[in-house]
């Protein structure tokens, strides 16, 4: 790894739990393929992507896609520097040059014409042709990992040509064992009774969301971990869960439903 990008070697906060998925992703990347992680909220897509970059010892480039993402945001744009017009390199350009792992976050949020600039980068050509500048060859270690939530508000259907350039891994929903492992890793001193109740609460919400009884807003693993963290600071469990999970529903009827589910686990 080159000296100027060593600060991009980031150790993930948490390991990824899920041997089979991890093996599939590692083998795919070793064979020179790019990976697309598809799954609903709280399935660990970004955690897996960060862990893969760390395991391979490559710099990480996080590229968040949104409706206004265009090719200049990915590859770069002209800028004025030292009385000259120069190319300000975008994250995809840098990732390709330094052999990084580009995490294309919420890849289905961008317009398809913006993402089409990646086509030559992701297939057998492995080049980026920058108009008015050089053609750059992809570093042999460079890989791209896309993440997406299918069917969420603001998302679009992915272009078939783009999907064909990825190996797609469907991330399974969290199980009780995985959830317990995550909580124990984050909070080693957590009591078994509390562990059971928090895991149970999250799984109850996950089941309700899968059956379309509630939205996915309260299905928030980051929120649950933050709530446990706040409890360590002395806030009551009810108030902490309200901040981390319940209050993320702004619809009053749904919030009451979530409060009832929470009440069965944390009286």
Residue ranges, per PLM feature:
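Residue-level signal for secondary-structure boundary elements
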Residues: 191, 207-214, 236-239, 252-253, ...
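Short, amphipathic alpha-helical segments that act as regulatory/interfacial helices
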Residues: 29, 203-206, 225-232
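A short, ordered amphipathic alpha-helix with a cationic face
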Residues: 169, 214, 232, 247-248
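C-terminal engagement/docking regions of AAA+ P-loop ATPases
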Residues: 8-9, 237-267
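The conserved phosphate-sensing helix
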Residues: 214-226
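Juxtamembrane/interface motifs at transmembrane-helix termini
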Residues: 199-202, 216-218, 259-262
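AAA+ P-loop NTPase catalytic core and its hallmark functional loops
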Residues: 1-203, 210, 236, 264-267
